[in-house]
């Protein structure tokens, strides 16, 4: 994985060596995501933020089918705390690489990633 890439019509942007960010992923995308070298998916989207988003359980179960780990560190607006940043940072530290972070647009995920880089 050397640069940004597409899975179906979803742009997955490179943040750092083994870290990528995107908008909301869908269940059928996970197989192709796994084939691109992603080993960990981290959701930063709260459950039920949108009626059409898959649940964390659905995403976790689908990810397991392709040997991809799924974690969730949800937040919105002012609910981002130092504890969540530290939890997020620990998840990435324990990862074997190939990390995909997502939320509704990718913006929140980029923010928490940046803060974790600066603070940890």
What are these regions (language model features)?
Residues 1-100, 111-120:
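Cys-dependent protein tyrosine phosphatase-like superfamily
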Residues 103:
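Short cysteine clusters
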């Amino acid at each position: 994985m050397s640069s940004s890439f597409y899975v179906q019509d979803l742009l997955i942007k490179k943040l750092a060596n083994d870290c990528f960010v995107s908008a909301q992923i869908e269940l059928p995308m996970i197989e192709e995501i796994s084939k691109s070298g992603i080993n960990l998916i981290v959701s930063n989207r709260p459950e039920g933020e949108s009626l059409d988003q898959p649940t964390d359980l659905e995403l976790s179960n689908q990810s397991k089918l392709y040997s991809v780990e799924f974690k969730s560190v949800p937040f919105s607006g002012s609910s981002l705390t130092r504890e969540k940043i530290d939890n997020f940072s620990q998840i990435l530290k324990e990862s074997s690489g190939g990390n995909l972070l997502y939320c509704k647009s990718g913006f929140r995920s980029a923010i928490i990633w940046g803060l974790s880089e600066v603070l940890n």
